[in-house]
Swiss-Prot record:
Functional note: Catalyzes the transfer of an acetyl group from acetyl-CoA to tetrahydrodipicolinate.
A Gene Ontology biological process term: lysine biosynthetic process via diaminopimelate
Superkingdom assignment: Bacteria
Phylogenetic placement of the source organism: Bacteria, Bacillati, Bacillota, Bacilli, Lactobacillales
Molecular-function annotations in GO: tetrahydrodipicolinate N-acetyltransferase activity
EC supergroup of this enzyme: transferase
Protein species of origin: Lacticaseibacillus paracasei (strain ATCC 334 / BCRC 17002 / CCUG 31169 / CIP 107868 / KCTC 3260 / NRRL B-441) (Lactobacillus paracasei)
Keyword RNA-binding: no
Protein name per its UniProtKB record: 2,3,4,5-tetrahydropyridine-2,6-dicarboxylate N-acetyltransferase
Gene: dapH
E.C. number: 2.3.1.89
Pfam families per the UniProt record, alphabetical: DapH_N (PF08503), Hexapep (PF00132), Hexapep_2 (PF14602)
Record-stated family: Belongs to the transferase hexapeptide repeat family. DapH subfamily.
Assigned keywords, A-Z: Acyltransferase, Amino-acid biosynthesis, Diaminopimelate biosynthesis, Lysine biosynthesis, Repeat, Transferase
Pathway: Amino-acid biosynthesis; L-lysine biosynthesis via DAP pathway; LL-2,6-diaminopimelate from (S)-tetrahydrodipicolinate (acetylase route): step 1/3
Catalytic activity: (S)-2,3,4,5-tetrahydrodipicolinate + acetyl-CoA + H2O = L-2-acetamido-6-oxoheptanedioate + CoA
Amino acid sequence: MAQLDTQKIISTIANSKKTTPVKVYLKGKLSELHFPKSVHAFIGKHTGTVIGDWAEIKPILKKAKLDDYYVETAGRNTGVPLLDIKAANARIEPGAIIRDQVLIGDNAVIMMGAIINIGAEIGAGTMIDMGAVLGGRAIVGKHCHIGAGTVLAGVVEPRSAKPVTIGDHVMIGANAVVLEGTTVGEGAVIAAGAVVINDVPAHTVVAGVPAKVIKQVNDQTEAKTVLLDELRKL
């Protein structure tokens, strides 16, 4: 997939057909129900399930003679579908929300509650921890750790031509914030709770609000921030 720029992401969201994806459980006389091909219909004699856009399903249900039905709604007027993750060569835990047109590298790990927006890229062997947010087009290199609750700002709103870019082998502690357009160099360490508003040089440790360089990465730093390949095995 070609890398999306800011305007392409905005245009994709603005111009996409908006849908309300639903799953509907049906009970009653179903033999006379006929749904369009765009709706996935699994119909038995007296019970069934249909999956599709509520705009297509609702008119049919209004005319049907049903004993009962129940609607599960996944979203309302959604502009970007979720990524089909079946083919991803990665560990993606339940509860992660990953939108379409996201690139996920081999052996990456995406934990529960992580939110990955359209156009983001996650390098091989990188872990996105619980509740972390990768905004639109955020780019994370190989073998990184993005801590729980961390936010990498996106390019959409406020608009930014340059995405957040995280180099390879970067460790970001919990609840850090990296603002739009910022580049974090290879091997850098960002302390928990830091707010990064400027580029971070490679192999440095930054901390604070706003984040400032407090030292160079040394043997002691590397020992404290070592990543575990065992957690990235599939």
